[in-house]
């Protein structure tokens, strides 16, 4: 009997909390090869240094509907020359209904970027290859850890402000 009551509560909670992907799209992208065509005539082996910068932001666009934008900037340098620079703003529109403030923050700051990253990675790989360079496959990113780190930094900053 107690088991039935627990299952019913779980079922009701599951019905209340709803998550749906409404749309995934490229909001903005840029590919630059500032040192072409000379970068292709290099005699040195292709072993560039890569720099990846990630950020994400979100905004509420309607009741229970949010846009999340994952921004990636990848810079490849060969020696002191920039081989290429890729910037992608991969976006998604998500319907989130019935979540508490903490859960909503985690979904928008971690779960949604996790959904968007494979799409952004594909755009980066495609642009780099079409730009005449060897394929670039970005490693997976732990957005849960990044979100936790960001929350910890916010709490530390808040605690520092209170002390002053």
From Swiss-Prot:
<keyword id="KW-0813">Transport</keyword>
<dbReference type="InterPro" id="IPR003708">
    <property type="entry name" value="SecB"/>
</dbReference>
<dbReference type="GO" id="GO:0005737">
    <property type="term" value="C:cytoplasm"/>
</dbReference>
<keyword id="KW-0811">Translocation</keyword>
<comment type="similarity">
    <text>Belongs to the SecB family.</text>
</comment>
<comment type="function">
    <text>One of the proteins required for the normal export of preproteins out of the cell cytoplasm. It is a molecular chaperone that binds to a subset of precursor proteins, maintaining them in a translocation-competent state. It also specifically binds to its receptor SecA.</text>
</comment>
<dbReference type="GO" id="GO:0051262">
    <property type="term" value="P:protein tetramerization"/>
</dbReference>
<protein>
    <recommendedName>
        <fullName>Protein-export protein SecB</fullName>
    </recommendedName>
</protein>
<dbReference type="GO" id="GO:0051082">
    <property type="term" value="F:unfolded protein binding"/>
</dbReference>
<dbReference type="GO" id="GO:0015031">
    <property type="term" value="P:protein transport"/>
</dbReference>
<keyword id="KW-0143">Chaperone</keyword>
<keyword id="KW-0653">Protein transport</keyword>
<dbReference type="GO" id="GO:0006457">
    <property type="term" value="P:protein folding"/>
</dbReference>
<dbReference type="InterPro" id="IPR035958">
    <property type="entry name" value="SecB-like_sf"/>
</dbReference>
<comment type="subunit">
    <text>Homotetramer, a dimer of dimers. One homotetramer interacts with 1 SecA dimer.</text>
</comment>
<dbReference type="Pfam" id="PF02556">
    <property type="entry name" value="SecB"/>
</dbReference>
<keyword id="KW-0963">Cytoplasm</keyword>
């Amino acid at each position: 009997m107690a088991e039935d009551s627990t299952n019913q509560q779980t079922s009701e909670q599951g019905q209340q909390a709803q998550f749906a992907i409404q749309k995934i799209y490229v909001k903005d992208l840029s590919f630059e090869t500032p040192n072409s065509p000379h970068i292709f005539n290099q005699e040195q082996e292709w072993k560039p240094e890569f720099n990846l910068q990630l950020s994400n932001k979100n905004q509420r666009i309607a009741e229970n509907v949010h846009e999340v934008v994952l921004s990636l900037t990848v810079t490849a340098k060969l020696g002191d020359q920039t081989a290429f620079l890729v910037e992608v703003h991969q976006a998604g529109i998500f319907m989130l209904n019935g979540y508490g403030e903490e859960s909503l923050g985690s979904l928008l700051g971690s779960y949604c970027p996790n959904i968007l990253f494979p799409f952004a990675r594909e755009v980066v790989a495609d642009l780099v290859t079409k730009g005449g360079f060897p394929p670039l496959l970005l490693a997976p990113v732990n957005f849960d850890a990044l979100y936790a780190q960001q929350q910890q930094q916010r709490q530390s900053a808040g605690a520092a402000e209170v002390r002053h």
